Amino acid sequence: MTIDDDLSRIAEQEKVLSFDAFDLTTAWQLGKLLQELATERGLGIAIDVTLHSMPVFYAALPGVTPDNVNWVRRKRNMVLRYFRSSYASGLKLQKDGKTVEDNGLSGADYAPHGGSFPINVKGSGCIGAVTVSGLPQRDDHNLAVEALALMLAKDLDTLRLA
């Protein structure tokens, strides 16, 4: 797939993977689902679910290092700044030949890499982010999308990046 193909598919993901309502219980369920998927697959990842600026779920599975904590923070910052997935932001920067620094942001605080996805609520927009770190960026992104698709009973095959 080309960058444009990926950006188009991610835009569709962000549109389709939207909740009617999302609260602290839903946040916990999303984080727990990701933890279960990762454990079943033996994935060493960090998982974070944040509403606005409030962390509501965090898990670090075997294999995670302190670096993953920082990656989570930096990827999440991309979503909370631009209200789109960190992977989409990174692909757009790559397509345009730009960096986060070109947008006046610090690379120490913003990571335009896959793994953080907006938590969107219909009629409200982005209210937070779900973030995965520990895999290659495309896999981090796909795992977050998979969990959201499962929670929302959406067809993952039509949403997943190839």
UniProtKB/Swiss-Prot annotation:
It comes from the Bacteria. InterPro entries: PduO/GlcC-like (IPR005624), PduO/GlcC-like_sf (IPR038084), YBR137W-like (IPR010371). It holds the Pfam family HbpS-like. HAMAP family: UPF0303 (MF_00761). Belongs to the UPF0303 family. This is UPF0303 protein RL3365. It comes from Rhizobium johnstonii (strain DSM 114642 / LMG 32736 / 3841).
